[in-house]
């Protein structure tokens, strides 16, 4: 009896693999294109945008240079538009699992990266823009919760209009929970903010605004913890059982938005033989290269003294990292800096696609 041998996974060869499709990863892709580098992007989420898309797409951002203010999702959309002329492939719902050293035909060092979906990338450099690492929202730990996810139980607000006319419970005590409770009160039929104690892990002005809204009868605030979720015969949410020192009560609800924060960890990259500091990658600030040749980090995942966790800092880090990555991709060529406005071919590509 003969069998057909299983073929080895196809290996994609490119200059740079960018791990993470958040704002920093998207800007890095644009920078790669400007420099003449080919790149591909891998992200554990199912779409581009990182935390901006997954957790707070409608949250205002005010600290991007030359952009007085925009929503987080708008920033992602603009970055996608900016890098679109280069048409870099993006691979979603998979994470970079392992890396090994290899060489190309001329003997120059390369890296072989494999994802948990079996994709393989032969690259000159890896730029990790994975934010806080692989992350997921902290989920409601009730047995009935899983069946309600995406229909009535949400871990992010992606569209305020989705909750129009609904009774909504927002659970959590951080800035995100308070911000969304305040925003939803203008759309939902009724909003109840649920937190386990009177104190909050949020900015003072946000807490004051919430308490003022409660005092004005615009929303409710309940101290307690989720003890159960109630559904009707169709499996739709009808209410939440809340436990407190005073006993139990049932709060009617059509939707529950649970904003307990994120569970994040570096994931497999922590085993990539790099100097790690508290789950982040230590880098040389002249190039943002890690302790392992050819692997760079930019954005929140990068560690160095006086590091500022700002999107604009990540843009700067990615730009410098890619200039060093260029020398790994083209070791026998010099990178000549040319302003995009003075490069006719590049200008044509960026303006007309």
UniProtKB/Swiss-Prot annotation:
The keyword NADP applies. PANTHER family: THIOREDOXIN REDUCTASE 1-RELATED-RELATED. Signal peptide: none annotated. It comes from the Bacteria. Its EC number is 1.18.1.2. SUPFAM superfamilies: FAD/NAD(P)-binding domain. It catalyses: 2 reduced [2Fe-2S]-[ferredoxin] + NADP(+) + H(+) = 2 oxidized [2Fe-2S]-[ferredoxin] + NADPH. This is Ferredoxin--NADP reductase 1. Keywords: FAD, Flavoprotein, NADP, Oxidoreductase. InterPro entries: FAD/NAD-bd_sf (IPR036188), FAD/NAD-binding_dom (IPR023753), Fd--NADP_Rdtase_type_2 (IPR022890), Ferredoxin-NADP_redctase_2 (IPR050097). Belongs to the ferredoxin--NADP reductase type 2 family. Binds 1 FAD per subunit. Its cofactor is FAD. The lineage of its organism: Bacteria, Pseudomonadati, Pseudomonadota, Betaproteobacteria, Burkholderiales. It holds the Pfam family Pyr_redox_2. FAD binds at residues 43, 51, 56, 96, 135, 300, 341. GO terms for molecular function: ferredoxin-NADP+ reductase activity; flavin adenine dinucleotide binding; NADP binding. Homodimer. The keyword Isomerase does not apply. It comes from Cupriavidus metallidurans (strain ATCC 43123 / DSM 2839 / NBRC 102507 / CH34) (Ralstonia metallidurans).
């Amino acid at each position: 009896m003969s069998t057909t041998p299983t073929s080895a996974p196809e290996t994609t060869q490119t200059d740079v693999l960018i791990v993470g499709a958040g704002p920093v990863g998207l800007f890095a892709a644009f920078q790669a294109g400007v420099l003449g580098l080919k790149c591909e992007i891998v992200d554990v989420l199912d779409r581009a945008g990182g935390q901006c898309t997954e957790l707070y797409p409608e949250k205002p951002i005010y600290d991007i240079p030359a952009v007085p203010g925009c929503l987080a999702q708008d920033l992602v959309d603009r970055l996608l538009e900016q890098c679109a002329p280069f048409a870099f492939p993006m691979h979603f719902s998979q994470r970079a699992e392992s890396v090994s050293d290899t060489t190309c035909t001329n003997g120059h060092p390369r890296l072989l990266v494999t994802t948990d979906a079996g994709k393989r990338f032969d690259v000159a450099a890896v730029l990790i823009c994975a934010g806080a690492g692989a992350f997921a929202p902290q989920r409601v730990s009730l047995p009935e919760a899983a069946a309600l996810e995406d229909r009535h139980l949400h871990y992010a607000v992606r569209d305020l209009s989705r909750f129009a006319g609904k009774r909504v419970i927002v659970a959590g005590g951080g800035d995100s929970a308070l911000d969304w409770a305040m925003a939803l009160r203008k759309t939902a039929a009724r909003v109840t903010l649920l937190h386990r104690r009177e104190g909050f892990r949020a900015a003072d002005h946000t807490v004051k605004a919430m308490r003022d809204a409660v005092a004005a009868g615009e929303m409710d605030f309940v101290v307690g913890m989720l003890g159960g979720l109630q559904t009707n015969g169709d499996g739709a949410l009808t209410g939440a059982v809340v436990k407190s020192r005073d006993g139990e009560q049932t709060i009617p609800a059509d939707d529950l938005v649970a904003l307990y924060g994120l569970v994040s960890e570096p994931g497999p990259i922590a085993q990539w033989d790099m100097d790690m500091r508290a789950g982040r990658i230590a880098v040389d600030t002249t190039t943002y290269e890690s302790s392992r040749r050819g692997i760079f980090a930019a954005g929140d995942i990068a560690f160095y003294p006086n590091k500022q966790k700002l999107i604009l800092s990540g843009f700067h880090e990615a730009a410098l990292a890619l200039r060093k990555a260029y020398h790994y991709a083209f070791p026998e060529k010099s990178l000549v800096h040319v302003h995009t406005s003075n490069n006719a071919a590049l200008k044509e590509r960026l303006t007309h696609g």
